[in-house]
Swiss-Prot record:
Family annotation (PROSITE patterns): RNA_POL_K_14KD (PS01111)
Protein location: Cytoplasm
Organism: Sulfolobus acidocaldarius (strain ATCC 33909 / DSM 639 / JCM 8929 / NBRC 15157 / NCIMB 11770)
Protein name: DNA-directed RNA polymerase subunit Rpo6
Record keywords, A-Z: Cytoplasm, DNA-directed RNA polymerase, Nucleotidyltransferase, Transcription, Transferase
NCBIfam families attached to this UniProt entry: PRK01099.1-2 (NF002207), PRK01099.1-3 (NF002208), PRK01099.1-4 (NF002209)
Amino acid sequence: MTIDKINEIFKENWKNKLTKYEIARIISARALQLSMGALPLIDTSNLKSDDVISIAEEELKRGVLPITIRRIYPNGQVELISVRKIENR
């Protein structure tokens, strides 16, 4: 298999999914924003916990985060993916 074929297989399988590393990065970045005083994008009154990580996880789960993931492939190609359009929240 060539590297281009491997890249195509990866893109097809992960086009609408986030890796565990991307999820961790998104949640940690949003939790940092919340801890620095950013307003939550969801109503936090009915959440079990009011810590910033729980709020960030719920925002990701509901798909309200205006964050874009930049994936760089081994061949140098760059793909931008909006978190709002991802299926596996």
